[in-house]
UniProtKB/Swiss-Prot annotation:
This is Nucleoprotein. GO terms for cellular component: helical viral capsid; host cell cytoplasm; ribonucleoprotein complex; viral nucleocapsid. InterPro entries: Nucleocap_ssRNA. Homomultimerizes to form the nucleocapsid. Binds to viral genomic RNA. It is found in: Virion; Host cytoplasm. The keyword Transcription does not apply.
Length: 439
């Protein structure tokens, strides 16, 4: 914990560093690093600079475990009948043992998620689903408390219980068969800084969990999870440097794969902070075809073929079949494009959804239809735009991006038997997306 410092001092130091960089005096570098404004890598912390810019220059701040925080000096907090203001002072290392005082301080750090709904969904999941070999083992879930194991979730979190562990615990209260899953640890007290740390870690971890489930399809794993951390999670919820294994550790003592992650899909994400909510809705897992269709629709579309003069009925059959295939591919692509922004419909295709389609190679078939709907020139132009836009997500799927370079680029998806979309219909897609019931 650092000593309080005026915002103006840090802003002036940052301005000087920005103009002189490595030539800045050593005391400037030390000051900025001490307060987390300048990272050891030599880059400014976007989180810290954004926080400073939102404060008046006469305010004072300190560095906590969670980053910069406004310092509030309270000489007589009981004036005018007000509640004691929450202060971060040198006494923050002293443990508080009075439960009512802990509650007062805890209430200033609230969760913005529907905890009751999460609890209800977990209860329903536990009643109806068997986890088999992925079930929790004895003592795997650690619950910390201040002498009252029946306390509310926020109090358990304040005591140091991890958020997913706490959710499982409060959802399984009264289930005597599950008591052996929990290792109970009584905490005698907690200091100011740990109250803030425990709750803020839980808040950022649960928000990251929502983003990862909605956009990547699952909770973060431990050391074996090689997926990339979304930029939003790194820059908005953390301070740039975080791994999936770290987020996993903040969520639960037990392996996160054992938590019934599908319950997150049952929660009204509009209760989340607006930025987190928007990010969840923007890129829902299982809906690559929707994003592909929206992107591809701006490139040259095939036209139906016209019969040659004097064509015989026999020679017209292949042409009619080709035209039907062109017509179907365009209809599929155009319908998928209408699903852009329809996050509730898209949620039905999420890998954890009970309503996800059971058609084998479903996304591959839709991708084939989208590619088939474009002319050869349209496909080439689309690939060039993907390269120009540096869209790594699209480039990583060769079925959509193709292989080769320039005019010689090819799309093997068009010849894969498993990508045949003849059994896909727009009416069928409407049923899969639940259009009739939700739009």
């Amino acid at each position: 914990m650092s000593i309080p410092i005026k915002v103006s001092q840090l802003i002036d130091a940052k301005t000087k560093w920005e103009s002189e960089k490595e030539k800045s005096p050593a005391e400037i570098l030390t000051l900025l690093k001490t307060y987390g404004v300048l990272r050891d890598t030599g880059a400014l912390s976007s989180k810290s600079t954004a926080f400073l810019s939102g404060l008046s220059k006469d305010k004072r701040v300190i560095l906590t475990d969670e980053g910069l925080a406004e310092f509030k000096s309270v000489e007589n907090p009981h004036d005018q009948g007000e509640k004691p203001a929450f202060t971060l002072a040198s006494s923050s290392s002293i443990k508080i043992t009075n439960i009512e005082v802990i509650k007062q301080k805890m209430e200033q750090e609230t969760f913005q998620i529907d905890q009751l709904k999460l609890k209800e969904q977990i209860e329903n999941f536990i009643k109806t689903v068997t986890l088999d070999d992925e079930s929790y083992t004895e003592g795997e879930i650690i619950i910390k408390h201040f002498g009252n194991p029946d306390a509310e979730l926020n109090m358990l979190i304040t005591a140091g219980t991890k958020i997913l562990d706490g959710l499982v615990y409060v959802s399984m209260k009264g289930d005597t068969k599950s008591l052996n899953l929990f290792k109970m640890e009584q905490v005698d007290g907690v200091c100011d800084s740990d109250i803030i740390k425990n709750i803020r870690v839980a808040k950022r971890a649960i928000q990251a969990a929502f983003v990862l489930i909605f956009t990547q399809g699952s909770l973060p794993g431990k050391a074996d999870d090689k997926r990339k951390v979304p930029e939003f999670v790194k820059s908005k919820l953390y301070d740039g440097d975080v791994s999936l294994s770290q987020i996993s550790e903040e969520l639960s003592h037990a392996p996160t794969k054992k938590f019934p992650a599908r319950v997150f899909l049952k929660i009204d994400i509009d209760n989340l902070p607006s930025a987190v909510c928007s990010r969840c809705k923007l890129n829902i897992a299982g809906n690559r075809s929707v994003r592909y269709a929206g992107f591809a629709s701006s490139f040259q579309t095939k036209q139906k073929l016209s019969p040659a003069v004097g064509a015989t009925p026999e020679s017209l059959m292949p042409l009619l079949e080709t035209n039907q295939k062109i017509e179907k591919s365009i209809a599929i692509r155009d319908f998928l494009k209408t699903m852009e922004g329809q996050w509730k419909n898209q949620k039905r295709l999420h890998p954890l959804s009970d309503e996800k389609p059971t058609i084998k190679n479903f996304t591959l078939k839709l991708t084939c239809a989208i590619i088939y709907s474009l002319t050869p020139d349209g496909r080439i132009d689309m690939a060039e735009r993907i390269i120009t836009d540096k869209n790594k997500g699209f480039q990583n799927d060769r079925n959509f991006f193709g292989d080769g370079e320039g005019p010689t680029r090819t799309w093997s998806v068009l010849t894969k038997p498993e990508a045949d979309f003849s059994n896909i219909t727009v009416d069928g897609l409407k049923g899969i997306f639940g259009v009739a019931s939700t739009m």
